[in-house]
């Protein structure tokens, strides 16, 4: 179908495939307490408790988690040289940090928070249902040969452009499950190869991400031994991501940074289908309430959240519906249609969306590496632009005025959530750097 987007200050730039900032007109205070949402504050707390219960098993399965007692967590990195390079040195930019999920253990991306959580939760539930784990028994039993042998009769499947597939595949194989990852035509060869080395079956589809997910779902529906991790509809994925907000809150507290009405918090979250950024944003709203403002970032040709939310439609709108191509080097964000689940949750909770051009992503990737040795994928580098749009763009200044925060910006804290990069092979990363040099 063809969709005509309503009048909006960002519309023409969006349709022309140029970088811009869209401010969500439906954004409102206390939206998290809306009664008809499919998730609640209580669900975020339950997810935190689930992570704690699973931690001993995670430490047993992944040696890199021994020192953290099974916690999957990333550093909060203060911008120093990179802050100068990005032009964020003046007072109006307040505090600026990278939340380095690009260097998360186990899977090397933010998807470790969702994919690992859902697979390990499925394993626990399956074991309890089949008498392999009783009440009060040590969850580390699930890493033993008896459980692994049982799990080998089941397959965990997922549709992915790359990083979720890595996360789910790594988690499933660690427990003894078979694993199948349906990948779109946008998937990078190194991610396909890494999965196959782990013994994961990779099925590549000629079509885009949405089609890969639909194919994976159809196959799983026909086989009771296949568990499908549904990136479009999964509450488990969403809530796995949401627990990251409590980790961030603790890190800010350790640094003596207060978040309240006078000291706002801004999150800049790269977005594909929306589960990871939506989950993190929801978790942050559960903790910080109206004092946190979450912005998604999407490629100029794949702004699926932006076009759907700008349209105001109850039916999901695709980037193809407005004449965009869904072609981008940021493979983790090459998604034509956002999750309906995330759209419902974030409709009134998302502050806005900004877009980035591929050439700029490569420049930012190189800048992050040269200045602070932050190894990022192009999609992760998109987070670095957030404060620029909020402070310098006309719509960003209008947002500040509407929220009554212009005078508070020097006391604000900006979190640039870098979502992946540490697992990129050195040869591929050098190619990224060469591409950055080529575009100037």
From Swiss-Prot:
Top-rank lineage group of the source organism: Bacteria
Keyword vocabulary terms for this entry: Lyase, Pyridoxal phosphate
Enzyme class: lyase
Entries under SUPFAM superfamilies matching the protein: Tryptophan synthase beta subunit-like PLP-dependent enzymes
Pfam annotation, one family: PALP
Residue numbers bearing the N6-(pyridoxal phosphate)lysine modification: 111
GO BP: D-serine catabolic process; isoleucine biosynthetic process
Catalytic activity: D-serine = pyruvate + NH4(+)
EC number: 4.3.1.18
Names of the cofactor(s): pyridoxal 5'-phosphate
Any one Gene Ontology molecular-function term assigned to this protein's record: D-serine ammonia-lyase activity
Similarity-based family: Belongs to the serine/threonine dehydratase family. DsdA subfamily.
HAMAP family from the UniProt entry: D_Ser_dehydrat
Name of protein: Probable D-serine dehydratase
Upper lineage: Bacteria, Pseudomonadati, Pseudomonadota, Alphaproteobacteria, Hyphomicrobiales
Gene field: dsdA
């Amino acid at each position: 179908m063809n969709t005509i987007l309503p009048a909006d200050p960002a519309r023409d730039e969006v349709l022309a495939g140029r970088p811009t900032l869209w401010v969500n007109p439906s954004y409102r205070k206390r939206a998290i307490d809306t009664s008809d949402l499919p998730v609640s504050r209580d669900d975020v707390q339950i997810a935190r408790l689930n992570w704690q219960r699973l931690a001993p098993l995670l430490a047993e399965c992944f040696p890199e988690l021994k020192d953290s007692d099974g916690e999957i967590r990333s550093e909060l990195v203060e911008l120093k040289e990179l802050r100068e390079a990005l032009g964020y040195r003046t007072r109006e930019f307040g505090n600026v940090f990278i939340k380095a999920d690009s260097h998360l253990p186990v899977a090397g991306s933010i998807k470790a928070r969702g994919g690992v959580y859902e697979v390990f939760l499925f394993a626990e539930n399956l074991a309890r249902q089949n008498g392999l784990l009783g009440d009060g028994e040590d969850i580390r039993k699930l890493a033993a040969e008896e459980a692994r042998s049982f799990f080998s009769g089941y397959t965990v499947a997922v549709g992915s452009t790359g990083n979720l597939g890595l996360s789910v595949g790594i988690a499933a194989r660690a427990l003894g499950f078979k694993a199948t990852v349906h990948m779109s035509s946008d998937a990078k060869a190194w991610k396909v190869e890494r999965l196959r080395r782990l013994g994961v079956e990779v099925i590549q589809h000629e079509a885009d991400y949405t089609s890969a997910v639909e194919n994976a779902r159809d196959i799983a529906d026909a086989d009771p031994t296949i568990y499908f991790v549904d990136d479009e509809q999964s509450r488990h994925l969403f809530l796995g991501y949401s627990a990251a907000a409590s980790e961030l809150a603790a890190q800010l507290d350790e640094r003596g940074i207060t978040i309240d009405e006078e000291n706002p918090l801004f999150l800049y979250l790269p977005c594909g289908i929306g589960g990871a950024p939506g989950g993190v944003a929801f978790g942050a709203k559960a903790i910080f309430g109206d004092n946190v403002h979450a912005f998604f970032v999407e490629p100029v040709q794949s702004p699926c959240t932006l076009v759907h939310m700008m349209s105001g439609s109850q039916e999901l709108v695709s980037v193809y519906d407005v004449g965009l191509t869904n072609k981008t080097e940021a493979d983790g964000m090459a998604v034509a249609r956002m999750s309906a689940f995330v759209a419902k949750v974030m409709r009134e909770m998302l502050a806005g969306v900004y877009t980035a051009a591929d050439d700029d992503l490569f420049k930012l990737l190189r800048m992050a590496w040269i200045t602070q040795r932050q190894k990022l994928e192009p999609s992760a580098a998109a987070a670095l632009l957030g404060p620029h749009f909020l402070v310098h763009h006309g719509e960003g200044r209008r947002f500040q005025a509407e929220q009554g925060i212009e005078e508070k910006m020097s006391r604000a804290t900006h979190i640039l959530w870098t979502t992946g990069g540490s697992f990129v092979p050195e040869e591929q990363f050098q190619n990224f750097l060469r591409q950055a040099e080529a575009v100037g």
